[in-house]
């Protein structure tokens, strides 16, 4: 069922981590989850105008403050001139949440292989009347050139402004959806065009994770088995017991 389930949710706790990293119990959980969504919507809406290229937002909570990590392709657009933009953003989030908010901006080194940024770039081009085939093929070429091992892009809707909606997809490389150790980045973006909404789905395969760790664990287990066998032989294991049970032949 790897083709049906969400690629990120399928790998949570194994090679993927949650974007809301905090713990609580009781009815407060629902309120905090809702507040996290409000924070993400506000940050994405505000920074979308600046074309900052926000790939993801990670929220961490303590009893006193909220820490927001913004992963952006253009961190300068988030910080602003002399830090004005990030200070205004912090003050506005303080007002919304009622708590002290700390913002850290992390630069995305390779935005060409981030599924969210690829989807937003295609949506931006479609909204500006660029051919969807050209936008998809160009994004695939850039991702493969940047080091992706596989990519698949699917667009659905009134493509090209036709009357009947349809879907088209382009793929290059491999996308192992059922392999849990495969680092598959996924994003879903909506482009609002004159003809209507167009859904964009992006899968990017960045390689395998945990391969070295799995090999190390297997090697450690094999080493324990070898040490156990050597210890049994040194103390007189099964072979020694068989030798002791043999009685010498009576030569008399």
Curated annotation (Swiss-Prot):
Renumbered residue ranges of the record's region Disordered: 222-252
A biological process from GO: translation
GO molecular function terms attached to this record: mRNA binding; rRNA binding; structural constituent of ribosome
Domain of life assignment: Bacteria
Domain KH type-2: residue ranges: 39-109
InterPro entries (alphabetical): KH_dom, KH_dom-like_a/b, KH_dom_type_2, KH_sf_prok-type, Ribosomal_S3_C_sf, Ribosomal_uS3_bac-typ, Ribosomal_uS3_C, Ribosomal_uS3_CS
Gene Ontology cellular component list: cytosolic small ribosomal subunit
Ranges of compositional bias, category Basic residues: 241-252
DNA repair is among the record's keywords: no
SUPFAM superfamilies, alphabetized: Prokaryotic type KH domain (KH-domain type II), Ribosomal protein S3 C-terminal domain
Swiss-Prot/TrEMBL keywords: Ribonucleoprotein, Ribosomal protein, RNA-binding, rRNA-binding
Assembly mode: Part of the 30S ribosomal subunit. Forms a tight complex with proteins S10 and S14.
PANTHER family in alphabetical order: 30S/40S RIBOSOMAL PROTEIN S3, SMALL RIBOSOMAL SUBUNIT PROTEIN US3C
Entry similarity comment: Belongs to the universal ribosomal protein uS3 family.
The protein's name in its UniProt record: Small ribosomal subunit protein uS3
Gene name linked to the record: rpsC
């Amino acid at each position: 069922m790897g083709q049906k389930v969400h690629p990120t949710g399928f790998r949570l706790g194994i090679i993927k981590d949650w974007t809301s990293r905090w713990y609580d119990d009781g009815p407060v959980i629902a309120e905090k989850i809702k507040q996290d969504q409000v924070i993400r919507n506000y940050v994405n809406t505000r920074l979308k105008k600046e074309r900052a290229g926000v790939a993801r937002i990670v929220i961490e909570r303590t009893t006193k403050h909220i820490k927001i990590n913004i992963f952006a392709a253009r961190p300068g657009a988030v910080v602003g001139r002399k830090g004005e933009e990030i200070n205004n953003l912090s003050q506005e989030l303080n007002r919304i949440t009622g708590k002290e908010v700390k913002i850290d901006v992390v630069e995305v080194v390779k935005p060409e292989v981030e599924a969210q940024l690829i989807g937003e770039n295609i949506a931006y081009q479609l909204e500006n009347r660029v051919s969807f085939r050209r936008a998809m093929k160009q994004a695939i070429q850039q991702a493969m050139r940047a080091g992706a091992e596989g990519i698949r892009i699917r667009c659905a809707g009134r493509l090209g402004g036709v009357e009947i909606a349809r879907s088209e997809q382009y793929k290059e490389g491999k996308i192992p959806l059922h392999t849990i150790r495969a680092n598959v980045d996924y994003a879903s973006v909506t482009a609002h065009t004159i003809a209507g909404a167009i859904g964009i789905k992006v899968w990017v395969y960045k390689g395998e994770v945990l391969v070295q760790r799995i090999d190390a664990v297997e090697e450690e287990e094999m080493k324990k088995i070898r040490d156990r066998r050597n210890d049994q032989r040194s103390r007189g294991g099964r072979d020694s017991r068989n030798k002791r049970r043999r009685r010498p032949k009576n030569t008399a």
